[in-house]
Amino acid sequence: EEKKKTLKRTFGMREAVTITVGTVVGVGLFTTGANVVGDLGPAVILATLVAMLISIYPSLLYAEMGAALPYAGGTYQYASLGIGKPFGMLAGWNFIISLVSVTSGEALAFSFYFKTFFSALGIELPVSDTVVATLIVLVFIVTNVRGIEMTGKLQNGFMFFFWGVAIIWFLMMLPNVNMPNFVQMPDFIAKSTPLSFIASVSMIWWCFAGFETCCAMGEEIKYPQINIPRALILAPFIVFAVNSAFQWFLVGIVPISEISSLATASAPFAEAMKTAGILGFPLVLLAAGIAFGGDFSTLNASIAVPPRYLFTMSRDGAMPKIFAKVHPKYQTPYVSIIVLGLLSAFLIASNSMIYIASLSLFADLFYYVIGITASLCLRKRHPELKRPFKAPGIMIGAPISIIIYLIMMTQLDKEAMITGIIWCALGLVIYAVCRSKYKNEAQEDLSGVIEEEIPSPEEKKKMDKEFKIWSIVVACAVVIVLVAYVIPFLIG
């Protein structure tokens, strides 16, 4: 029985990176992250840089916890052990609704770009956005129930397709980039305040939220003590490079006098191309890359990850035991996958990207505050824990990170706060009922989950080579993007 309730380790570092980045690169980048270009113009690079910087240290904290405790469930497990079960439940509960919201928002974004793709070809689809979005969620529910190997292979395929299309689109857009746009600041920038800049950083930070996604699948990652820290070291820099590159093209192709229109656009990239008069094949290519690459990669990952949290919480007695059921053939938490997928479909019915984004952002910030606090408490309560990776300066870095994230929470609208509080209250009620019902049951034996795996010398050498290649490529991407923003100032 225990064997059935332990998930299968099949992911390597590459899958850990692509699933993590795939969860992040999508709805935020193509909606709120691009909307901020309309608020800040070329100064958007500063907000994106700040968003990356405030993600790096928390990412290192998660690298430490993920390597030491490679469970399915991530922050839920870390907070349960470090702070206490109720905080673990709140962390897991908010992580779940955050990514369920991302799934819903991503499905709606897919629907728009899917229809834009056909519209650019002269074909108008007589189907509503909500119907298309719901259907694509159902497709990914099936692929995720079928097995984690399929999930990983699909994720790699989606990410590489996205980047293949993105590179071609970048090359096609280069002749349309107007360098003076980066030097001229829009008139409305003068009205910006420190609080409005913090609000912009918060919106762009949503593009980074989820940088620790691979921790939630720690029980399915091979050699997690090595692969989880490596994936988390790379993730914030990859997300920065991706967001900054796409923002650069938005700034470059849209006339500076009309760039403010992007702030309220539901699909900023399509709006930007239409404003710049760039139609035909480039628009078809953009829609294909976003819909079948960026959106698909995020949908695949955001449907795959939350069920691992619910699975672990159920296995631990914090949620109804039915969610701990593992498929006898595919060894996946199929009940959790199906239920959360249907919850995503329910949110899609709201057809409101603003509501979905606000709910997700509240949940993101709240569970990160809990997770960062857990890293501090784990150091104090469990000093004996074997830590293959250790974050430096935790006594300074963790409190500063908590303060920053709490400040960002003050920029959320009241509706998001109220919705998030109601969701937390509901979770606490379910938790109390389950703890009362299962209080006499023994905890699952997870000793096999946290047992360290040692790769052979040959395999370790191969893993080191892969990480080195990824590190070089990511470093080059970050440098290239930063140089791209500096060049317009150098050439006058």
Label every model-predicted segment.
Residues 35-39, 47, 56-137, 141-145, ...:
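Hydrophobic transmembrane alpha-helices that form the core helical bundles
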Residues 11-30, 136-139, 188-246, 250, ...:
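Hydrophobic, membrane-embedded alpha-helices of multi-pass small-molecule transporters
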Residues 114, 128-179, 191-192, 232-237, ...:
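Membrane-interface loop-to-helix entry segments
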Residues 77-78, 84, 116-121, 187, ...:
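TM-loop-TM module centered on a large, flexible mid-protein loop between adjacent transmembrane helices
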Residues 160-188, 247-254, 368, 372-385, ...:
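Hydrophobic alpha-helical segments and their helix-loop junctions in multi-pass secondary transporters
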Residues 322-331, 368-417, 433-473:
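C-terminal membrane-solvent junction of multi-pass transporters and transport-like membrane proteins
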Residues 1, 80, 107-131, 165, ...:
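Helix-loop-helix connectors at the membrane interface of multi-pass transporters/channels
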